[in-house]
Structure formats: C-alpha cells, structure tokens
Amino acid sequence: MNGRSSNSKSDEKLTAPTLYIFPHAGGTAKDYVPFAKEFSGEVKRVAVQYPGQQDGYGLPPLESIPGLAEEIFAIMKPAARIDTPVALFGHSMGGMLAFEVALRFEAAGYRVLALFLSACSAPGHIKYKQLKGYSDNEMLDLVARATGTDPEFFNDEEFRVGVLPTLRAVRAIAGYSCPPENKLSCPIYTFIGSKDWIATREDMEPWRERTTGDFSLREFPGDHFYLNKNLPELVSDIEIGTLQQFDQI
C-alpha cells in the first residue's frame, strides 16, 4: 500500500496481522463473507461464529456481554499466536464483544494493533439500558404491551422457551456496562451511519475515553447497516489502519 514504511521493522519476517470480525446480534460468520472478501491478502481475516447459536444463526445464548466475551476468548486463545499481531472489528453488538475480547488479548500479552467499532454505542450510552433490571416476566409483559398481544399468550411454555433466550440477549445488550478504568492502549476507530438512530454520534463519541491511544469517528451515508452500501470505503479504512499500525512495530 502507498505510504508503507520498509525500515520500521527489524529484519525478521513478522507474521501478517489477523483481523477478527465480530458479527452483529443475530448475525453469523457467513453473513460477513462479502465483507471479508473486500480485503487484500495482506490481512488475514477470521469471522467469529458465536458459541451456542442454534443451526448457525440467531442470537447466541447471552447472559452478559463480558461473559460471552470470556467464552469467545477462551475458544480463540489456543489458535492465536503470541507473535501474530491482531486487530478486531465489530458491528453493533459485535463491537461490544470485540472491545471486551481486545481487553483480554492485551491483558494476556498479545499485540493488539487497533479496534474498529461500527454502529456500536459506548458503554453507558446504550439505548434502553433500563431493561437491565427487568425480570423475564417483566420483559414478556413489555413485549405484550408494545405489540398489543394478549398477556395470556405468554403463559404457553413452548412459546416462553422459544422467545426468552432472545429477550434475555436483548436485556444483556441493553444493560452492558464496563468500569471506566478498563481501557485499551491501541487506537479505536469508529464508524457510524448518518441516519442511524440506534447508535448515534453522541452514543459513539465516548469510545474515545476507552483508549489511551488515538481515536477517530467517520460518518457514512446510511442507517444502522450503512456498511452494506459502503463496503469498499469501510474496508479500505480498516485495512489501512491495521497495516499502518503493523508498520510501526
């Protein structure tokens, strides 16, 4: 790529960086194949399949974002090499998980080049965070009132078994928080859609407080899934950011 330095590394050959891709809630690794294919061969891409997703789709079993991140990191760690720099990208809920996993990578001594967050509100700025304290029955009652459904319908055990995991996942996402002292040393680069009401500029700006490194925010035209129509530009930003950090090793 233009502007890459040849004298910032020592003579030994470094392993190409790995970019871990964290899908949105309900998304799968397969959904991000077009995204991954936009990159050049200079960056290895690994799309994360969340543990526990039934038949490879739907929301994973989720009691808390940090809990799922811990499980994901435990799965990733045996295959991750300490001498291979990593970067992480996450969209929406995937951004929360990417941040938590990045914290774990840094704590374990891995070199994290950068964290890329897309349409993901910062901890403490997530919509509907009041849902964190809701019980299962209160969540069901909220759905009944919001949809006009007869509350008696939710007494059906088969229906409850089917819908409650999703509601618990929504509750966990809405209630995600993280101690303010938990920060990364790598840069955080953020991206939003101009018409996204789920994660706004005001919701994402506080991510700058979660790194001791650089921070940037870029706005693309579009809504919460703006990336579908802006893949080449988004991927270019991510690849350039990753390789620039790689060149500084």
From Swiss-Prot:
Catalytic center residues: S92, D196, H224
Enzymatic class: hydrolase
Disruption phenotype: Deletion of the gene leads to a drastic reduction in PDIM and PGL production. Mutant shows increased susceptibility to several antibiotics. Mutant is highly attenuated when injected into the zebrafish embryo bloodstream, but virulence is retained when bacteria are injected into the notochord. Deletion leads to an increase in growth yield in vitro.
Claim: DNA-binding is one of the keywords in the record: no
EC number(s) reported in the record: 3.1.2.-
Entry's transmembrane regions: none
The keyword Hydrolase is assigned to this record: yes
GO molecular-function term, one example from the UniProt record: fatty acyl-CoA hydrolase activity
Pfam families, per the entry: Thioesterase
Reactions this protein catalyses: a fatty acyl-CoA + H2O = a fatty acid + CoA + H(+)
Domain of life assignment: Bacteria
Keywords: Hydrolase, Lipid biosynthesis, Lipid metabolism, Virulence
Cited Gene3D superfamilies: alpha/beta hydrolase
SMART domains, A to Z: PKS_TE
Database matches in InterPro entries: AB_hydrolase_fold (IPR029058), PKS_thioesterase (IPR020802), TEII (IPR012223), Thioesterase (IPR001031)
GO biological process terms, semicolon-separated: lipid biosynthetic process
The protein's role, per its UniProt record: Involved in the synthesis of both phthiocerol dimycocerosates (PDIMs) and phenolic glycolipids (PGLs), which are structurally related lipids non-covalently bound to the outer cell wall layer of M.tuberculosis and are important virulence factors.
Assigned protein family: Belongs to the thioesterase family.
Official protein name in the record: Thioesterase TesA
Species, as recorded: Mycobacterium marinum (strain ATCC BAA-535 / M)
Gene giving rise to this polypeptide: tesA
